[in-house]
Amino acid sequence: TLIKEWADRDIYSRIDYRKIFRPEMKTTVQELKRRGYTVALVSSTGPKLISRIVEEVGMRPEFDLIVSGKQFKQSKPNPEIYHYTADTLGIREDECFVVEDSTVGIEAAYRAGMSIAGLKDDRFGFDQSKADYHIDSISDILKYL
């Protein structure tokens, strides 16, 4: 609805994503690319907000594919978003390594048959028990790949 769209726009327009951006994200993604990995950004967030964020933090060129959950009928924990991403990139699900922090994101990747690193985030008390690995920082994934 128009009211919800306006409320969402107002909330997110006030956030300076450069201030909350994880600084190791860019160097980690660049290292993954240097090692020959394909890197996708898969988010439940809407495409306009994803676009704004990756532009603000200067990461758009780093991703081979950017996927929004708004492209699908069902959101996470439905694994469709991850199946679509793997298929689009021509990669088998069991060859994918996903970094997730939320319970529903981890469940979606688990149901898609992907390896999962649960990124620690103490703010929300997410259940990360289905993650294969537990990491404190994005850069920790480099130890596993």
Where are these regions (language model features)?
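Short, basic/glycine-rich phosphate-binding loops at helix/coil junctions
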Residues: 2-11, 63-64
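Asp-based, Mg2+/Mn2+-dependent phosphohydrolase catalytic module
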Residues: 30-33, 46-47, 51-145
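Alpha-helix C-capping/helix-to-loop hinge sites
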Residues: 10-14, 69-70
